[in-house]
Amino acid sequence: MTHGEELGSDVHQDSIVLTYLEGLLMHQAAGGSGTAVDKKSAGHNEEDQNFNISGSAFPTCQSNGPVLNTHTYQGSGMLHLKKARLLQSSEDWNAAKRKRLSDSIMNLNVKKEALLAGMVDSVPKGKQDSTLLASLLQSFSSRLQTVALSQQIRQSLKEQGYALSHDSLKVEKDLRCYGVASSHLKTLLKKSKVKDQKPDTNLPDVTKNLIRDRFAESPHHVGQSGTKVMSEPLSCAARLQAVASMVEKRASPATSPKPSVACSQLALLLSSEAHLQQYSREHALKTQNANQAASERLAAMARLQENGQKDVGSYQLPKGMSSHLNGQARTSSSKLMASKSSATVFQNPMGIIPSSPKNAGYKNSLERNNIKQAANNSLLLHLLKSQTIPKPMNGHSHSERGSIFEESSTPTTIDEYSDNNPSFTDDSSGDESSYSNCVPIDLSCKHRTEKSESDQPVSLDNFTQSLLNTWDPKVPDVDIKEDQDTSKNSKLNSHQKVTLLQLLLGHKNEENVEKNTSPQGVHNDVSKFNTQNYARTSVIESPSTNRTTPVSTPPLLTSSKAGSPINLSQHSLVIKWNSPPYVCSTQSEKLTNTASNHSMDLTKSKDPPGEKPAQNEGAQNSATFSASKLLQNLAQCGMQSSMSVEEQRPSKQLLTGNTDKPIGMIDRLNSPLLSNKTNAVEENKAFSSQPTGPEPGLSGSEIENLLERRTVLQLLLGNPNKGKSEKKEKTPLRDESTQEHSERALSEQILMVKIKSEPCDDLQIPNTNVHLSHDAKSAPFLGMAPAVQRSAPALPVSEDFKSEPVSPQDFSFSKNGLLSRLLRQNQDSYLADDSDRSHRNNEMALLESKNLCMVPKKRKLYTEPLENPFKKMKNNIVDAANNHSAPEVLYGSLLNQEELKFSRNDLEFKYPAGHGSASESEHRSWARESKSFNVLKQLLLSENCVRDLSPHRSNSVADSKKKGHKNNVTNSKPEFSISSLNGLMYSSTQPSSCMDNRTFSYPGVVKTPVSPTFPEHLGCAGSRPESGLLNGCSMPSEKGPIKWVITDAEKNEYEKDSPRLTKTNPILYYMLQKGGNSVTSRETQDKDIWREASSAESVSQVTAKEELLPTAETKASFFNLRSPYNSHMGNNASRPHSANGEVYGLLGSVLTIKKESE
């Protein structure tokens, strides 16, 4: 009767079976032996009685059915008493009840497929009832024949094994006893067929055989259907007769059912005992199988991996598997599909039969648990298949499928699998659904990592080639994906929780995997990233899944960083890499140094078609979308951002710009610990970035949008430390590549900050002396922006935001206005803090927080609300930046960098001027409080950034295109420099999104500093899509910094942006106001400050970047750690390098890369 309980949901579906069983169980439930009671109730209980009794007594019956007599009276009074005595006299009633349970289990088998698929009510009840009932009657008849022999054995087994193994046995017993019960029911059904036909219409239940057996009772039992499942199989035949008589004599059901009850009791006894015997045997088998299930699943996973690698059929099988798994996950949308999947599950030896319902709601979270469970068999099979799928995708089939799924299935994936939503459908990306399921399940990712490591680097080349071959077709698919991404917005809303669960589970697992990976070495890292990325590839193929299912949030970051840029890079391999030898060298470089990185890149390239366009479109749409929509699509946001970026990428600025930088980013992402290796790779990539340099900036910005969302998801997951460390690992890697661009961008961005046409050299000379000038200068990081410093002495903190304050289009720039003032007040104290930070980053981060809190009273009011969330983020960043000198902090800080990139993006958007001190201090606090940090706030902040970025990006992309590739490159470089600097501050993620936003916000300023030399590698990095935003005239200096004169329109845009951003982000606006500083005052101050901070905040941004320079210098020894400060160093050193050609400690490699890139 526990059987009935578990089956209760199914029985609820089987209203007839449940109704009749409820009637029997209602009488039976009190006595615990539901069979006798059920038969009695079926025999003499009226329909109403059955309803009443089943409602109350059914639970008891479920609990156990041995004590039938005591509660039989309760169930049906005197009739129940008679029945109870009848049943009591014959222990067969327990067996009969067990048989009924077996019948109901048989029904469950029918139902369970639906139930396993997460569709309890999925199957049409009325239609299937007759068919199921007929088959059930046949099986019951055969059971009835065999009951006599095994009656007593089954009774004993029933008492012993049935209750023990009702859950596992019910399926087996259902399967085994199905024939017996069907035969028994058939014979009984023939008797009660005339009566059964009446209820047949009433029976909507899945189990038609049982329905027929219960059909006489079905009309009233429909209401009870949920309760009587357990005992129903027992009395199915008897009930059919008794219920038929009851249905006929509903007014007086007790009269007719009594003979029926006697007959049905005997029949149910026989069938139930046969059922019990079979069920006990099956239970024993199932208990054994349950133990074997895990190993079997693991073996099946391996087999599926191998088969998936070998066969495309694996795709289809995982397709079905993932389909039913997804159906389980999305019980609402794919119940029918779930029914199919449950059949698939049953087909699978490891079928998820027990845990299918679990997977339904929390499939992603449960998947990892279920992998350990027998229910995970199908999941693991599916995951293995999807793992194998990535392998074929790695290989030739990976090229084919990667291209196909990227082009055709990725949009579907975005719709169905990327969301992991109930909106999952068996589409072209059904295998990608398996990917999605796989990727959320970190075990599958890890399995891929372990099993696919060897395969993926080799197939990576094939995949790269296939991606290169299919990249352009994918770009149109990117648009499709964007449309689907929009459709996903609604889908993601329902599945967002699963995504968060996936993030929590997958992010932690992938964090562990990535953490394990990065220490292992570049190749191991690469291998793991290959496997993860192929796991992600499946997910990434529907980029929104990777983004939406940040379960593999680190993979998301990987795909965000590497994927977005590498998508661009792959696309740019086709488009931008004009020289095949260069492409070959870059690809070989990737494949050697980042063999798996390249696979990651390609994987991400695969998914960025949806991912980048999603990002750019998400960025562009985020302006359109409300804050709530962004929150809804946050899981999507990485997908949307990547999609959006990819949309821009088809504009080929992204395609050209992102190729090399994503590679560097991916290399860095893959081997954050292997900074020397990665640095060499980065240098190679920096050199290779020269041709494709412009793209990485945009790619970086897109990546940072993705990382932003990933950070938000990580924050939502509450594993900010792991995510941050991973993110920061990746971020410094990306920051290094970003630094390559950011170096130029820094000089450029310094010019950008120097909207006052302050030459980049001036800014960069101070930037070179940043740590030196930090102590001396009132704006410690204003060393880069001494001229800007005059306007925003406190804005050196915003050195990262140099370009950002230039353009109030950036929301963070509006915040930067507040932060600019705050930092202007704070900068004198913060300058010392910056110098100290270079010496004692943690200490100074605290000081920065204090300075932010103490020095700027006026600005603090505005900055502090931002700081409330952003202080946390900034403190996180500061902690990560200050602590990432420690290798362990490196990972944490890398993850924090990702997170902080997110938060820094938000922070930068909020108050880029206070970026260096306020942002870092706040990030420190935020890192500490990131888990408790309001996810909504961060989401809104990230949305705010994205929104700002999206319109600006679109405009600047168009303008960048208009302004020409070099200017675009130059413009994007400042953006990427800002993003790099911000990434240095916020980890490299921010440069893309925040810098893009800032650059977009003040493209004229930001892009003005960009030097034509930087356009090569930085060209499209962040600014290209946004360079169009610059309304100011660009006066490109051949030396490299392009002086941008911000026009009044741009300033108006700045002013517009802050209120627009706040208004576009009502939730963010509210949260900011709620955070302690009114957004209104922020907006007004932002408007004022934007006018001031157009130049003044440029200085502030420069200051922030300069602040990072000391930290970068301080962390120079840790550059190999690829800590956020490594990226900071890379970016800061890059900036001084472009300005002075100096190398700051470990920044030398990055600087060298940037020099060569330049």
UniProtKB/Swiss-Prot annotation:
Query: In the record, which positions carry Phosphoserine?
Result: 104, 218, 356, 378, 487, 518, 542, 564, 671, 807, 1001
Where is the short sequence motif LXXLL motif 9 located?
936-940
> Compositional bias of type Polar residues: which residue ranges?
406-435, 641-659
Main location per UniProt?
nucleus
Q: Indicate yes or no for the key word ATP-binding.
A: no
Q: Where is this region: Repression domain 3?
A: 735-885
Motif LXXLL motif 1 boundaries: 21-25
Sequence motif LXXLL motif 5, location on chain: 380-384
List the residue ranges of the region (Repression domain 2): 410-700
Phosphothreonine: residues carrying this PTM: 207
Q: Which residues does the annotated region (Repression domain 4) include?
A: 1118-1158
As annotated, the Glycyl lysine isopeptide (Lys-Gly) (interchain with G-Cter in SUMO2) covalent link is placed at 111, 170, 195, 198, 372, 508, 756, 802, 850, 901, 931, 1105, 1115, 1154
Residues spanned by motif LXXLL motif 4: 266-270
Q: Where is this motif: CTBP-binding?
A: 440-446, 565-569, 599-603, 946-950
Annotated spans, Interaction with ZNF366:
1-415, 753-1158
Q: What's this protein's function?
A: Modulates transcriptional activation by steroid receptors such as NR3C1, NR3C2 and ESR1. Also modulates transcriptional repression by nuclear hormone receptors. Positive regulator of the circadian clock gene expression: stimulates transcription of BMAL1, CLOCK and CRY1 by acting as a coactivator for RORA and RORC. Involved in the regulation of ovarian function. Plays a role in renal development.
Which disorder is it associated with? Congenital anomalies of kidney and urinary tract 3: A disorder encompassing a broad spectrum of renal and urinary tract malformations that include renal agenesis, kidney hypodysplasia, multicystic kidney dysplasia, duplex collecting system, posterior urethral valves and ureter abnormalities. Congenital anomalies of kidney and urinary tract are the commonest cause of chronic kidney disease in children. CAKUT3 inheritance is autosomal dominant.
This one is known as Nuclear receptor-interacting protein 1
Species of provenance: Homo sapiens
Q: What is the lineage of its organism?
A: Eukaryota, Metazoa, Chordata, Craniata, Vertebrata
